[in-house]
Amino acid sequence: MKFAVIVFPGSNCDVDMYHAIADELGEEVEYVWHDAENLDRFDAILLPGGFSYGDYLRSGAIARFSNVMKAVKKAADEGKPVLGVCNGFQILLEAGLLPGAMRRNNSLKFICRPVSLRVENNETMFTSAYKQGEVITIPIAHGEGNYYCDEQTLKRLIENRQIVFRYHGENPNGSLDDIAGIVNEKGNVLGMMPHPERAVDSLLGSADGLKLFQSIVKYWRETHVVTA
């Protein structure tokens, strides 16, 4: 399986994402610059955290116009796994690949610490390695992680089981309905504010994020014929 880590000007979690895939998961991965126009050779697309284009205007608002986003949309339309973490989630929202928007944290402060999440849906290509209702520890690092959507969108997210992760015990940023991560209706595009790539080794405090990447590989192997 081959992963693409998209790199925008201002990305700063691309190395962590690369490490998670190459060193912890043992899969093939490449950095892909934001001006790339074709992602056909990749099986999964990863949009890392950071401050793309300095987060000017709004987080992710400029990155959505990058050349590579047309290819990301194409990959999503084809059903390939697309994961956006933190700033990557914000970019997916701005690009219309996921519903809703991000606001500043209620505290108006940047928050960087581990948080508890509850797995709300373990029947997705990103969460099959988790148990339903499992509580996991994943770090956050953001100033604009306060997810918001209108009532109709929230109702649809709940009915379709598109809310994949919720903050557990404490909501660190004021996010609506404690939402920490959502998928699109097809279930192949996941956006989440917590950083699973920073939780792939117990030496760093948690390895709970590794299961997310393992789930992606498991899904891909179950849906593709692997030849030697």
Curated annotation (Swiss-Prot):
Active-site residues annotated for this sequence: 86, 195, 197
Catalytic activity: N(2)-formyl-N(1)-(5-phospho-beta-D-ribosyl)glycinamide + L-glutamine + ATP + H2O = 2-formamido-N(1)-(5-O-phospho-beta-D-ribosyl)acetamidine + L-glutamate + ADP + phosphate + H(+); L-glutamine + H2O = L-glutamate + NH4(+)
Keywords attached to this entry: ATP-binding, Cytoplasm, Glutamine amidotransferase, Hydrolase, Ligase, Nucleotide-binding, Purine biosynthesis
Database matches in SUPFAM superfamilies: Class I glutamine amidotransferase-like
Enzyme Commission (EC) number: 6.3.5.3, 3.5.1.2
PANTHER family documented for this protein: PHOSPHORIBOSYLFORMYLGLYCINAMIDINE SYNTHASE SUBUNIT PURQ
Name of the protein this chain belongs to: Phosphoribosylformylglycinamidine synthase subunit PurQ
Protein source organism: Geobacillus sp. (strain WCH70)
Species lineage: Bacteria, Bacillati, Bacillota, Bacilli, Bacillales
Recorded name of the encoding gene: purQ
